[in-house]
């Protein structure tokens, strides 16, 4: 009986740990006219991640913040004086490469993070 209880506790703990990782969501919002962005990590769902990114963008001074992307791995923002790119992927380098590709020439990575 103790063994069965032990296995049940281990299974529950493993499920909770897996669930927390599986539902950690990040999001990016961007305001074109003033080149401000919001970047959020480790939110419980897409709605929370989107709201967090929009709030951060507005708090940074963004006047026309728009939600751009959410992700459950790594996310990156690339910017130049004229362009913006958002990327995501299973690694930081993949997210950054996508952001740079979407942004175009003359862009640099402004922020890049991975869910933990």
PLM region descriptions:
Residues 2-6, 18-116:
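Helix-coil modules at protein/domain termini and other flexible surface or pore-lining loops
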Residues 8-16:
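Bacterial N-terminal signal peptides
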């Amino acid at each position: 009986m103790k063994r069965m209880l032990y296995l049940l506790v281990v299974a529950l703990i493993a499920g909770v740990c897996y669930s927390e990782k599986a539902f950690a969501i990040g999001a990016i919002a961007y305001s074109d006219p003033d080149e401000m962005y919001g970047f959020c990590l480790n939110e419980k769902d897409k709605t929370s991640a989107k709201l967090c990114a929009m709030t951060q963008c507005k708090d940074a001074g963004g006047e026309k913040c728009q939600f751009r992307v959410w992700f459950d791995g790594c996310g990156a923002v690339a910017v130049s004086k004229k362009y913006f790119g958002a990327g995501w992927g299973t690694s930081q380098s993949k997210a950054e490469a996508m952001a740079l590709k979407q942004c175009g020439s003359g862009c640099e990575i402004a922020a890049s993070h991975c869910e933990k």
